[in-house]
């Protein structure tokens, strides 16, 4: 594991946490799916020594092991004084599951029609600064469209992406932050091997000692 990657990720989290306090007057939110990437982000946030909260979007289709892991992980974090929140999906003002959503949409989600992401996976954090475990190595699309820092306006065409902490567009980015959710992807430049190496070196027991992924 390249320790420079760890330090860069920690610096990004500290920058995001500071910006969150300045612009939103609230702690940074670290989102977690219960998977390997977001679990690394939680561990890095703890190591960074920042003030943060943790949020999980309950998709209704997670494996039981993931649900059990989230419960145990949230118990561990709450015992350390870290606020944790679970968001349950709503559609048209009503609680939904994947199975109740499909009849309303008249089709299951597909690679091209991925309504499940916006309703089940990406809700919450409006008007706040959040982190995700998104990485460029996951797909060509993410390599082309995602960055270290992002704004998430309702119109995707107005999205601003920064890949340099000193980017000339930072002033525009910060202006847009006042109106929209902002995102930091601290491990965006990590490879799959980097993630697994970090888990093995830093949080193996915490993740795998009866907790699952």
Task: Walk through the language-model features, giving the residues of each.
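Nucleotide-activated chemistry modules centered on ATP-dependent adenylation/adenylyltransferase
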Residues: 1-213
């Amino acid at each position: 594991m390249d320790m420079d990657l760890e330090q860069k990720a920690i610096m990004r989290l500290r920058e995001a946490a500071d910006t969150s306090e300045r612009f939103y007057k609230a702690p940074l939110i670290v989102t977690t799916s219960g998977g390997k990437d977001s679990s690394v982000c939680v561990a890095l946030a703890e190591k960074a020594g920042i003030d943060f909260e943790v949020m999980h979007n309950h998709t209704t289709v997670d494996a039981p092991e993931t649900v059990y892991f989230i419960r145990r992980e949230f118990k561990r974090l709450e015992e350390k004084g870290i606020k944790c929140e679970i968001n349950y999906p709503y559609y048209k003002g009503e609680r939904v599951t994947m199975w109740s959503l499909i009849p309303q949409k008249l089709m299951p989600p597909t690679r091209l029609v991925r309504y499940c992401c916006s309703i089940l996976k990406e809700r919450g954090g409006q008007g706040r600064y959040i982190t995700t475990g998104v990485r460029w190595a996951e797909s060509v699309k993410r390599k082309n469209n995602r960055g270290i820092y992002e704004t998430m306006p309702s119109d995707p065409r107005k999205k601003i992406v920064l890949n340099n902490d000193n980017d000339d567009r930072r002033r525009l980015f910060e202006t847009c932050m006042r109106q929209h959710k902002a995102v930091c992807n601290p491990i965006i430049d990590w490879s799959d091997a980097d993630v697994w190496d970090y888990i093995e070196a830093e949080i193996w027991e915490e993740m795998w000692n009866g907790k699952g992924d």
